[in-house]
C-alpha cells in the first residue's frame, strides 16, 4: 500500500512541473488566460467541446476499462479446475472410449459457460449502476449556462462555482466573491482556504496558489467563475491517482479459495497415483488402472465449484444492489460477512450532518431571548452564502417567531466572515431611535479578543481574567455535551458613519452563546445494537474534538470507556497500540496516517476490518482494510480504492450488507463441505473396494455420470436459506476447518459405503459373477445417499423439522434422487454404461442404509459442534 507521503514523494518532480505551470498561469491576466485557452467569458462552442473531449479524453481520474464478452469467455476457461478437466479429457480420448471423453468435456464446458454468463451478467449490472452514479457541474457554452456531467468538462470551459460545488477540474479563477474552498482531500486540513481571482503570492505548494482551484476540492462558501486549465489525468488529482491506484491485497476469501484449490490439486494427484498403483499391482491391468485413476481424478475435481461460487457471489451482488449497495469486487462480499470491526467517522454516518440550534444562553447559563435575537439579526442580514450555522439560527428563529424583529432594524453594513478572524459582524440601525448597533458572532476565543466587557448577573462588567475563565468554563460545559458553541457580542455605535471595517470590532460586550448539535440519525442506535448483536464492534475514527465524539456516542449507545487522540497514538509503540485498539472505541483528532495505523493494528490483532471513508486521505485506510466502504458522493479516488460503494450513507445499509455477505458465505461453505466430504468419502471407499473386490466398484463412465448428476443436485444451493443463528456471528474463511469437516464426514460416508458393499455381496449375492449388478447398486445407493445427506449437512439443526431447505434445493435434490432411480432403467440398453435393473427389495435396503446414515450424521453433528463450536 502506498502511503500519502510516499505518493507525494513519487510525484514530486511532476508536482514541481505542475506548480511551475500553474504559477505562470496564475500571474497572467484574465484576458491572457482566455486567449491561451481559445475561449471567452461566453465559453467555447459545443462543437469545440466535442473536439477537445475526443482529443483529451473524458475528465476522469480513475480508469474504467471496458471488457468484452470474449474477455469473460476466455477468463472462464482459465479456472484451474476447468483446465484440469480439459487435460483429463484429452488424456482419456487417447486411452479410452469417446463417450467418457465427451462427458468430461461436457462437464468442463457447462461449468465454464455458466461462469461466463454469471460473470458477464455481474459486469453489465455494475456498469449500469455506475452509469447512474455521476456528478454534474455548471458551465457556460456558446453564451448559455448549462449543467453537464463532470466527465464531459474540457480545457477552456467556463465554470460557475457556488457553495457546495465540487471543483470539476483544475481551474484558474477569473472572478470571485468571498470564496472559501475545502482542500482537505489534499492537505488533511478541514479549515477552508480563501481563493481570490488574482494571484496574491508566490506559492511553494500547488494547493497554495491563491487563484487556482484543484479538482477534488469543494466550495464551502462564496461564488466564483473560472477557466478550466487541466482535466482528467493531467490534473493534480489525476497525477496523484496514478500512484494511489495499486493492486489491492487478495481478500481472505480469495486466499482461502487459492489454498483450497492447491489442496485439492495435491489431493487429486496423490489419490490418483495411489489408485493407479494399488489397482495396477492388484489387477495387473495397467491400462485399466490409468483409466480408473483418471476417473477418480475427475470425481475428486469439484467441477461445479467455480459456478457455485460465482452464482453465490453474483446473487449477493444483485441483492445488495437492491439495497443501495454497489459491489465493485464480488470477492469482497464474503469479507463483508466476516467483518468483526467496523471503523467509521461520526459525521453523516452516526449523525444527520446538519446542525440544529439547541441553546441560547447567557454567561450564567440562563436562556436569554435577546441572544437569540442578536444571532438572528446577524445571520439574517449577512449577505454571504448562508452556512449551516446561519441556516440553523434562521430556522430556529422562525419557529420561535423571532423573525419579526428584522422589521425594527435597517442594515447599514457588514464585516464578512473569514477564517483568520473566525467571526462575522453586521451593523444595523434601529427604526425606532436611529441608534446603531453592531452584532458579532464567531468562535469563542476570537470573540473574547474583541470584548472588553461582559454581561453577567444582569449587569455589564469588566472582562477580567477571572471573568474570561468563567465564560470559558460555561462554554466548556456545553462543548462536553458535544455541542458546537458560537459566541455572541454586541456594542452601540455613535460615529454616524455607514462604512465599517475589522478595526471597528473592538470594545464589545460579551453577551452569551448559541449552541448547536449535529443530531444523531434516528435509526443509528438500533442499528448499532443490531451490529453488536451480530458480533461487530463499531469504532469511531474522527478528526473532530473528543467532546463531540463522546457525546454522540452517548446518544447512540456506543460503549466507550476511554477516548484516544491522534497525538496519543503517535507516542505509542505498536505493542502499546495493539492493546489500546482493543479497549478503545472512540479515536478523535485523527489524521489519515493515524487512522491507517489503527486499521492496520486491528488487522494484525486478527480482526476482519471494514473501513468507511470518502476522501482522498481515506484511500490508505480503504486500501489496507479487509473491506473498503465508500459512498457515491465520495471523491473518485476514494471510490476507486473501495470494494463496496453505498448509494446511501447509512449504517443500516452496512448491516444488511453484512447479513447478505454471511448468507453468501454460508451457501458457499455448504457446497464446499458437502462436495469435498462426498468426494473424499467416495475415493476412500473406492480405495477400500479396489483392495478387496475382484472387480471395479464403479466403471469410469459410471463414476463420471454419478459425479455429473450429483453436481446437478447442488445447482440450487446459491438460492438456499441460511439459518438465523448462522448469521449472528462473523464468519472467517478457514481452510483447516474445511479439511477437518471433509475428513470427518468423508469417513462417515465411507462407513455407510462399506455397509452397502457387505449388503450387496452377502445379502443380494452381487459377487464376482454379478459385478454389473454390484456396480449399478453402488451407483444408485451412493448417489441417493450423497444427495439426501445434503439436507443434513446444510444446517446445524435437525433437517426437515427445525430447518428446511429452499424449495429450489428441495426440488433439485429430490429430482436428482428420482433421476438416479430411473437412470439404470433408461440406460439399461446402452452397453457402454453396463447398468442393470435392480429388484424392488434393493430399495428397501437403501432406505435402511439412509436411516442409519441419517442417525449417524446427527450424532456426529452434535459431537462436532460441541468440539469445534460450529457446524458450517
Where are these regions (language model features)?
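Membrane-embedded transport module
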Residues: 271, 275, 306, 556, ...
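Soluble-to-membrane junctions at the N-terminal ends of transmembrane alpha-helices
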Residues: 58-90, 123, 145-146, 203-212, ...
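C-terminal transmembrane module of polytopic membrane proteins
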Residues: 776-872
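Non-lumenal N-terminal regulatory segments of integral membrane proteins
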Residues: 1-145, 151-154, 159-160, 164-167, ...
